[in-house]
Design a protein with these regions (language model features):
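Dynamic "connector" segments at or just before major functional cores
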Residues: 1-181
């Protein structure tokens, strides 16, 4: 069995660790590629931007997922994490209730506007690539059964494995891990 001995630990009160250490880099990427600006330009759901813009809500939800969050309520864990907030350069982020209210404002046109902001940014990133970037493309397609308990989910049915769910198909550029629209 395990018999660790002679181990000593030191720590400092100034040590600040973050399990999702790359979240600051992800936010810098969103800024550098123009995604933040594109989200604010295309998605218009808020009458006032006090204190949050549309990009703050969209990216807050995305960052929650990147940090292992599985539901909007997990945003509260991020809100209480001082190191997470510092990594993003934020004093505060929208709470889960506000994020839910934001999501409920979307209609079909708003979803298309959100997708337009993402696509505009994707095209800008692709155009910045050198010519050899486009020498080879491998397209990958895969599907999965997504379990749901929603009673009104369009296309929901009982799957081969006995789960109630739906079957999205994801097509991506395998060499670049980029989703094809």
């Amino acid at each position: 069995m395990y018999r660790a001995s002679g181990i000593q630990y030191e720590h400092s009160d100034r040590v600040r660790g973050l399990a999702s250490g790359g979240i600051g880099a992800m936010h810098r990427l969103a800024q550098h590629t123009g995604l933040v600006t594109a989200l604010d330009a295309h998605v218009a759901l808020l009458k006032q931007h006090l204190p949050y813009h549309e990009s703050d809500h969209v990216l807050g939800i995305a960052y929650n997922v990147l940090c292992g969050g599985t539901c909007l309520q997990d945003i509260e864990l991020r809100r209480q994490d001082e190191v997470y907030l510092d990594a993003l350069g934020a004093q505060r982020i929208p709470d889960p209730t506000t994020a839910g209210d934001f999501c409920r404002r979307f209609d079909e046109a708003d979803i298309e506007a959100l997708q337009a902001a993402i696509n505009e940014t994707r095209v800008r990133v692709w155009r910045a690539q050198p010519a050899e970037f486009f020498d080879e493309a491998v397209i990958d397609a895969d599907g999965t059964v997504v379990e749901t308990t929603g009673e009104c989910k369009e296309g929901m049915d009982i799957a081969y494995n006995g789960l109630w769910g739906y079957h999205p198909l994801l097509v991506s550029l395998a060499t670049r891990r980029s989703r094809c629209s």
